[in-house]
Amino acid sequence: MGESNTAAPPSRSRSLSASIKGLFGKNSISSNEINGKKEAFVQSGTREDQRYNEEHHLKKIDTKASVPKKDTQLSPLSAPGSYLKKSTSIASSLHLNSGKQSVTSSRAQSISSDGNGFLSQESFISEEHEDDIDDTTYYDKSTRGFTNLSKEVESYSISRKNSIQQSRKASVDDNEVDKRNAHFPDSDTTIDSVLGDKNKNQKVMNQINSISNISRSGSVPANPPILSSKSRRGSNAMSIRSPSVRSTASIVSGNSNSEVITPSSKPATQNISEDGNIKKTDNTLKCVINSKHFKVYENGFHEHHLPVIDLVKGDSTDSLNSSTVSKGTEGIEINRQKSSFSLTGIFKKKNGDKMNELLDTEPFGNASSLMPTKAFCPRYKTKDGSMIEEPLEQETTHKKIPKIVNPYAAVGSEELKLITTLSDKIKKGLKNKDGQSRSGSQSGSASSSLHTSPVASSTSLSSKFHHALVTCSEKYGDPVGVIGHGTYGVVRVCSRPLLISDSAPFPSYCNDKKLFFAIKVLKPKDDEQLEKFSTRVTSEFIIGHSLSRRHKAHALQNKVCPSKRLAHKAQRKLDWECPNILRVIDLMETNNTFIEVMELCPAGDLHSLLVSRSQSGNAIGSLHPLEADCFMKQLLRGVQYMHDHGIAHCDLKPENLLFHPNGLLKICDFGTSSVFQTAWEKHVHFQNGVIGSEPYVAPEVFQLGKDYDPRLIDCWSCGIVYCTMVFGQYLWKIAIENKDSLYASFISQMKDENQFSLFEELRHVNADLNKLRKNVLYNMFQTNPEKRITVDKILHSSWMKHTRCCVSYNHSV
């Protein structure tokens, strides 16, 4: 390891295909053997450069507002408990810099060249965090727990009278406290009731901590039963699970390891009838925040109701969660609302006449898959209900590939073979300008599937679906409309009837009658080189496809260490399939046209959501802080998953964040992603060159000739995206001091005052949570990347640990 400590990590081309070329040369440092000596595997999160021999240390930030003077040199993320002993009142409104560019204006121009489970909501405290994080390093035990909503937050209109009375009563009657359900205290107005109030005694807090440990130990976190006040006071049960919900999870999911997504967190008792339908009782809780598309209840649970595009609205009400819709089961329904959302992150809107013209003049129903038969591993169900993939057979004729040293990498030997296969087929298809559809003519082509049941209507595919040739219209249905266009083509929505042979989890959005898919039609530009187009299409598809399917833990384990079992945490990393990555399903071709089949997210993207909020009465187009926190946690989870598997997105922005109606966030558009570590590499490869969309690009990217860690530019972009959600505006247009006055102001304030006025003016529903959030933002916006906080540490921060998210992740951070 000596060489890695004296030289900076090597940089590589952003192109996946270019990176693969020469990967296994004699002089390549990516080989797992250097000078005949084997080296230990280094995880993707470990920096080999001497600059990163030590872990990131959070920079101490002076947050003068609301902080005792003697502690102003300490950051709440690393400060002693006295830092948080006092809290000031929260202002009732946000003070924004009117000089910033509004998000409702024209979008940022790109500067690049080219679970299913059942209803649940993640706890305020992340799973297993006691083993990894000692909260006493952030605040003192005597002040553990956050205050309830401030009286001065008039916009939320929440009275604390009943909560205070209940708190006083709890301090007098200890027996009453023991009988109380700690997750749902008898309060009519508490948002952060899980954490309690500072006025509550330590016994209550210990009780809450013990219950939190129970909740994190389960494989499927379930929505606890909501009882009336009398029932809660008279009950001795401390369980936070509903037996009916837990039993249903195993029936619906068919995969005990899959993540649990909460289509709706309505705090009502839910029972499952004999026919599989959900029956809700009248024991509902009070809704304390009730906006058009976002609701928060007094127990802290929340739900999203994002409108869907008209194209997917049929005769039946859309399901909030496509994964839970199958024969005999139903998701919770929402009222249908009109929406003008589109996939603006990939394609821009086009007028209706041109869209219809494109729809009529570019048929692709006879397109056939370019995916080879062995490109997909058949999935099968184990005895415990988990889904695993059958390992691929090794081709003896293929060039010898070095031993895998990084089992977490998304790009491995199978992806390498797939790159070669697809590149050859794309080039052949482009050269054959006058050729017809290749359905039936390509011996290596075959349909593909990510689940055990066939998706084609032909009954002959029921047993050997992956050996038959199926056209696009048979597999994914007929086009029902165009939702946008871009430089390289158009995107359509296709739908087909939901068949009895279809089983959850479905590969894309589904209502109770149809499956919907997003079809991205790609054509080379007139002046584009064939090699360049082939590389672009192949790289984008391979990265998205490899991230959106479960990795083969058993096969990789045998390659890395046949005689030993992987550690439990490492095994979960291999098995985990992130719900926040857009599924890339198939790549097809017909008549010099290439078709990328993707999961449809019918609620549009974050940019459209912000614009719609601005148009519906919200002057700045911002989101509620609790709503923004939920989306931020999902974004960080998705980015963490990408980084764990050796890929950095490099172009995170609102346009590339799509939604399902239930608020499930999906990261899309991997065309500019960087593969910084493959399965054969021990080292993290740095990157150089400008890439991304200007308002979201980190400052080190603009330093020409210097290499940078692509993971840290993703972290910076996440911070910009969050600020866009809470401010409704860009922080600045470009992070170059002499080109943008707003960024120059940020640099000046941080140097002179060690704080930024906009961050100091941010407000939340809870004063202590606001401080924790503010200090994480300061560490995300470190202009020196070596001092910048990582995505992993953000997820381990107290802000994220105490952020409710509508996705419950079985995989711990």
Curated annotation (Swiss-Prot):
Its EC number is 2.7.11.1. The active site is at 651 (proton acceptor). GO terms for biological process: intracellular monoatomic cation homeostasis; positive regulation of endocytosis; protein localization. Residues 157-169, 226-274 have a biased composition (Polar residues). InterPro entries: Kinase-like_dom_sf (IPR011009), Prot_kinase_dom (IPR000719), Ser/Thr_kinase_AS (IPR008271). It catalyses: L-seryl-[protein] + ATP = O-phospho-L-seryl-[protein] + ADP + H(+); L-threonyl-[protein] + ATP = O-phospho-L-threonyl-[protein] + ADP + H(+). Residues 27-83, 95-117, 157-277, 429-455 are annotated as: Disordered. GO terms for molecular function: ATP binding; protein serine kinase activity; protein serine/threonine kinase activity. Residues 206-219, 437-455 have a biased composition (Low complexity). The keyword Lipid biosynthesis does not apply. SMART domains: S_TKc (SM00220). Residues 477-800 form the Protein kinase domain. One of its GO terms (cellular component) is plasma membrane. It is an enzyme of class 2 (transferase). ATP binds at residues 483-491, 520. SUPFAM superfamilies: Protein kinase-like (PK-like). PROSITE patterns: PROTEIN_KINASE_DOM, PROTEIN_KINASE_ST. Pfam families: Pkinase (PF00069). The keyword Phosphoprotein does not apply. Keywords: ATP-binding, Kinase, Nucleotide-binding, Serine/threonine-protein kinase, Transferase. Belongs to the protein kinase superfamily. CAMK Ser/Thr protein kinase family. NPR/HAL subfamily. HAL5 sub-subfamily. PANTHER family: SERINE/THREONINE KINASE, SERINE_THREONINE-PROTEIN KINASE HAL5-RELATED. Protein kinase involved in salt tolerance and pH sensitivity, probably by regulating plasma membrane potential and cation influx. Positively controls the TRK1 potassium transport system in response to potassium starvation. Stabilizes plasma membrane nutrient transporters in the plasma membrane by preventing their vacuolar sorting and degradation. This is Serine/threonine-protein kinase HAL5. It comes from Candida glabrata (strain ATCC 2001 / BCRC 20586 / JCM 3761 / NBRC 0622 / NRRL Y-65 / CBS 138). The lineage of its organism: Eukaryota, Fungi, Dikarya, Ascomycota, Saccharomycotina. The gene is HAL5.
